[in-house]
C-alpha cells in the first residue's frame, strides 16, 4: 500500500515523539513509524532522575508511554512497523517498511537513535541470551542471588552495575582503564555499594560456560599491562560499552561522520539532503541524553514546518 504524508518520522524515542508532538500541533498530520524498539532506549531504563518536570524518580517505560500518548492525543498517527529501505534521491522521499507499505513523504525526520555496542568476540555471540546481555533491566531478574560481571566504564556501565545489585549477590565491574568516565555522583554510589567490586586495567578475553544447559560460568579477563589472564566466576555478563548510531539505512544517501553519526548543519537538525532532518542520538555523539534528544526533536519539527511553508 502506498501512503503519502507531509512529514514522516522514523523512530519513537524522545526525539521522534517530541518531533511528532510539535509537527502534529502545527497541523502537519505527521506519521511516525515506531521501529523495532518502540520508545527507544528509555524503555530499557528503570529509574529516570534527570528528566525535567518530575520531582520524584520515574520509570523509563512509563515516561515513554506518556510521550507516546501525548503525541497521539495531538494528532500523530503512530505505525507499528519498521523501515527496511529508504530512497532520499529526490522528493517526495520514499520509505519502504517491513509490513510491505511504501510511504512518500515531503519531509523526513530521522530519529533512529543508537544501539548497544558489543565486544565482537566469538564467545560473546555464543552465549548471548544464555547469560550474556546488554540490558540489565531486561535480564537482571534472571540472576537473583547470583554473581555478575559488568563490562565498561561509562555512565551505562555504572548504572547497570548499581541496578544489578537489586538482584545479584555480587557485581564485579571490569574496565580497561584505571578510572571511570561516569558522572561523579554515580561513581560515589558505586564505590559505596558493598555488593560491587571493581577490577581496573582489564579487558575481556573470553566468556566461558557450559553447554548442558547452555549457560555462562565465568569470564576470562586479561591485564592490559602484564597480559596475564585470570578467571572471574559468574553466572551473567552484562556488556555496557556504549552505543552505535542506527544509520545503516541511510548509508551512501546522507552525510555521516567517521563513526556513522548523521552530520547536521551547525545549530540545526538539517542534514546534507534538503528536506531530511535528524534528531536525537543518531546525530548526537556528545550529550546523548533524553532531554537533549527531545529538544532536538522539537528543533527538527520547527525546521520542518519552515521548510514546508517555503
Curated annotation (Swiss-Prot):
<keyword id="KW-0285">Flavoprotein</keyword>
<dbReference type="Pfam" id="PF07992">
    <property type="entry name" value="Pyr_redox_2"/>
</dbReference>
<protein>
    <recommendedName>
        <fullName>Thioredoxin reductase</fullName>
        <ecNumber>1.8.1.9</ecNumber>
    </recommendedName>
</protein>
<keyword id="KW-0963">Cytoplasm</keyword>
<keyword id="KW-0274">FAD</keyword>
<feature type="disulfide bond" description="Redox-active">
    <location>
        <begin position="135"/>
        <end position="138"/>
    </location>
</feature>
<feature type="binding site">
    <location>
        <begin position="34"/>
        <end position="41"/>
    </location>
    <ligand>
        <name>FAD</name>
    </ligand>
</feature>
<dbReference type="InterPro" id="IPR036188">
    <property type="entry name" value="FAD/NAD-bd_sf"/>
</dbReference>
<keyword id="KW-0676">Redox-active center</keyword>
<comment type="similarity">
    <text>Belongs to the class-II pyridine nucleotide-disulfide oxidoreductase family.</text>
</comment>
<feature type="binding site">
    <location>
        <begin position="281"/>
        <end position="290"/>
    </location>
    <ligand>
        <name>FAD</name>
    </ligand>
</feature>
<dbReference type="InterPro" id="IPR023753">
    <property type="entry name" value="FAD/NAD-binding_dom"/>
</dbReference>
<dbReference type="GO" id="GO:0019430">
    <property type="term" value="P:removal of superoxide radicals"/>
</dbReference>
<keyword id="KW-0521">NADP</keyword>
<dbReference type="InterPro" id="IPR008255">
    <property type="entry name" value="Pyr_nucl-diS_OxRdtase_2_AS"/>
</dbReference>
<comment type="subunit">
    <text>Homodimer.</text>
</comment>
<keyword id="KW-1015">Disulfide bond</keyword>
<dbReference type="GO" id="GO:0004791">
    <property type="term" value="F:thioredoxin-disulfide reductase (NADPH) activity"/>
</dbReference>
<dbReference type="InterPro" id="IPR005982">
    <property type="entry name" value="Thioredox_Rdtase"/>
</dbReference>
<keyword id="KW-0560">Oxidoreductase</keyword>
<dbReference type="GO" id="GO:0005737">
    <property type="term" value="C:cytoplasm"/>
</dbReference>
<dbReference type="InterPro" id="IPR050097">
    <property type="entry name" value="Ferredoxin-NADP_redctase_2"/>
</dbReference>
Amino acid at each position: 500500500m502506498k501512503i503519502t504524508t507531509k512529514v514522516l518520522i522514523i523512530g519513537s524515542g524522545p526525539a521522534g515523539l517530541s518531533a511528532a508532538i510539535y509537527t502534529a500541533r502545527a497541523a502537519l498530520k505527521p506519521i511516525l513509524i515506531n521501529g523495532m524498539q518502540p520508545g527507544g532506549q528509555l524503555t530499557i531504563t528503570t529509574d529516570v532522575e534527570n528528566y525535567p518536570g518530575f520531582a520524584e524518580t520515574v520509570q523509563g517505560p512509563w515516561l515513554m508511554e506518556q510521550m507516546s500518548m501525548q503525541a497521539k492525543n495531538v494528532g500523530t498517527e503512530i505505525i507499528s512497523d519498521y523501515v527496511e529501505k529508504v530512497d532520499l534521491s529526490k522528493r517526495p522521499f520514499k520509505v519502504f517498511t517491513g509490513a510491505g507499505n511504501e510511504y512518500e513523504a515531503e519531509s523526513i525526520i530521522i530519529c533512529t537513535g543508537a544501539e548497544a555496542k558489543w565486544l565482537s568476540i566469538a564467545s560473546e555471540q555464543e552465549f548471548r541470551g544464555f547469560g550474556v546481555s546488554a540490558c540489565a533491566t531486561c535480564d537482571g531478574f534472571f540472576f537473583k542471588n547470583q554473581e555478575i560481571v559488568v563490562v565498561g566504564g561509562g555512565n551505562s556501565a555504572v548504572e547497570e552495575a548499581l541496578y544489578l545489585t537489586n538482584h545479584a549477590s555480587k557485581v564485579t565491574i571490569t574496565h580497561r582503564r584505571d578510572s571511570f568516565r561516569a558522572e561523579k555522583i554515580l561513581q560515589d554510589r558505586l564505590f559505596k555499594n558493598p555488593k560491587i567490586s571493581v577490577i581496573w586495567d582489564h579487558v575481556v578475553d573470553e566468556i566461558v560456560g557450559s553447554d548442558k544447559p547452555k549457560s555462562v560460568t565465568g569470564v576470562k579477563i586479561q591485564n592490559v599491562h602484564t597480559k596475564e589472564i585470570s578467571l572471574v566466576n559468574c553466572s551473567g555478563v552484562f556488556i555496557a560499552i556504549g552505543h552505535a548510531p542506527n544509520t545503516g539505512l541511510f548509508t551512501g544517501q546522507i552525510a555521516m561522520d567517521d563513526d556513522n553519526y548523521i552530520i547536521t548543519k551547525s545549530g540545526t537538525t538539517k542534514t546534507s539532503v534538503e528536506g531530511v532532518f535528524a534528531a536525537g542520538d543518531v546525530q548526537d555523539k556528545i550529550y546523548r541524553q533524553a532531554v537533549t534528544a527531545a529538544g532536538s526533536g522539537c528543533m527538527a519539527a520547527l525546521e520542518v514546518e519552515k521548510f514546508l511553508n517555503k
